[in-house]
Amino acid sequence: GTCLIDEHMFDKDALIFDNGQITKAGITLPDGTPYVEISCEGFPNFGIWSAIGAPFVCLEPWMGRCDNTGYEGELSEKPNINALKPAEVFDKSYMISIK
């Protein structure tokens, strides 16, 4: 789908998408011409945000995210938390295309 970004869209914080809802996102110019696109298969969370008054928007694939309001559980119980053993490696990547 498409979403028009306006100056107040992030006044209450980031837009957060869970459960792998977003695998590709992009920004277009006002005339609809593609400007930038991010492909991010396999990331459980995706954030779209901007600082108030900032001249930019961030598109970020996340492997985890901040707590929901009122969360009081342990760090190890958070959704999508990754725990690595000593010397274990976790590798993940995404692609950004500038049009």
Question: Whereabouts are the PLM-identified features?
Answer:
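Active-site/ligand-binding surface loops and adjacent short beta/alpha elements
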Residues: 1-41
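A general structural signal for short secondary-structure junctions and capping/turn motifs
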Residues: 17, 27-28, 48-50, 85-86
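Glycine-rich active-site loops that engage anionic ligands at enzyme catalytic sites
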Residues: 29-70
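Short alpha-helix capping/helix-loop boundary micro-motifs
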Residues: 75-81
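Short Pro-Gly-centered flexible turn/kink motifs
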Residues: 82-98
